[in-house]
Amino acid sequence: MGFLRCCVYYGILAVVSFFIGRLLPKSWFHGDKFPYRCASWEAKLFRFLRVHEWQDKVPDMSKIVPKLIPAKKLDTDFRAQLPRMIEETCVAEFTHFVLILLGFYALRLWPGTGGAVVTAIYILFGNLPFLIIQRYNRPRLQKLLAAQQRRSRRNQEVQQ
């Protein structure tokens, strides 16, 4: 019975957190400020974890809810979407972090080894990889945005 309670709890968390993530004001999320700003050491960690090799292999919410912007299918005007994409990485990171914290409640629903195993699986495979992917992709998107902004400034200077 504990397993079923945990699964129902995690399912409800997933659905509710998705909708809350969509409703949160995007003005709360800034990729260049704490806690979303990536530290310099994170790039080494991501290389060690080989995030670039497995990030495309994990399930992607944008395939389930196509209104999200899938990074793999950028249209020709993707540069205009970069600020929103950066915000989305912050929202997704926040959501998965909260889900990790709330995931520990399952230990009350199913105390003991079984609950601990299910909670560990939920956190280690259901949320942590997605949080890592957001932190891995955000600096790359920020570099693209910065390059785009530099190009725009140069073009404006040339036109004047």
Sequence positions of predicted segments:
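Residue-level signal for alpha-helical transmembrane segments in multi-pass membrane proteins
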Residues: 20, 102-109, 129-132
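Hydrophobic alpha-helical transmembrane segments of multipass integral membrane proteins
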Residues: 16, 97-104, 120, 124
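Transmembrane alpha-helical segments and their cytosolic interface motifs
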Residues: 82-114
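N-terminal leader/auxiliary helical segments
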Residues: 1-17, 21, 101-102, 138, ...
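A cytosolic-side transmembrane-helix exit/cap motif
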Residues: 32, 135-146
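Membrane-proximal soluble regions of multi-pass membrane proteins
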Residues: 27-81, 85, 147-160
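Hydrophobic alpha-helical transmembrane segments
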Residues: 1-9, 108-121
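Hydrophobic alpha-helical membrane-embedded segments
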Residues: 7-54, 123-131
